[in-house]
């Protein structure tokens, strides 16, 4: 993939309110298990996974697998474009749901 394609993929990943919400959520809470995000964001697993993959492929997220669980976080370090995009996203008026930690209580079903 050339530089233009990478840039366009990154930009297009931000054209969805759900993905903006996911970025704000992970920016606030840090590394989070998919099951906790699913419960906190009230989203079915397949829809959440699709959005997480788009953000990961666009270079915004990293995944850390622990056994059968997948934990996502904002990739660090981000390049200048992604850092500035995340800074702008922080100023958007988006209600960030409370983190529900099913993975810590053993209630995670994923």
Write out the residue ranges for each language-model feature.
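Glycine-centered, phosphate/nucleic-acid-interacting loop/turn motifs that mediate DNA/RNA or nucleotide
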Residues: 59
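Short beta-strand "wing" residues that participate in macromolecule-binding interfaces
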Residues: 63
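N-terminal helix-turn-helix DNA-binding core of bacterial DNA-binding proteins
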Residues: 5-46, 66, 70-78
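Short, hydrophobic-biased segments on the C-terminal half of alpha helices
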Residues: 52-53
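Amphipathic alpha-helical dimerization/coiled-coil segments
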Residues: 2-6, 28, 76-110
């Amino acid at each position: 993939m050339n530089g233009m394609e990478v840039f366009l993929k990154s930009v297009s990943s931000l054209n969805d309110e759900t993905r903006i919400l996911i970025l704000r959520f992970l920016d606030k809470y840090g590394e989070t298990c998919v099951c906790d995000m699913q419960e906190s964001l009230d989203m079915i697993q397949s829809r959440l996974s699709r959005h997480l993959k788009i953000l990961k492929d666009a270079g915004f997220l990293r995944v850390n697998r622990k056994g059968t669980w997948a934990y996502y976080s904002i990739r660090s370090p981000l390049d200048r474009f992604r850092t500035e995009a995340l800074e702008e996203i922080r100023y958007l008026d988006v209600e960030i749901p409370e983190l529900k930690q099913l993975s810590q209580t053993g209630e995670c079903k994923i």
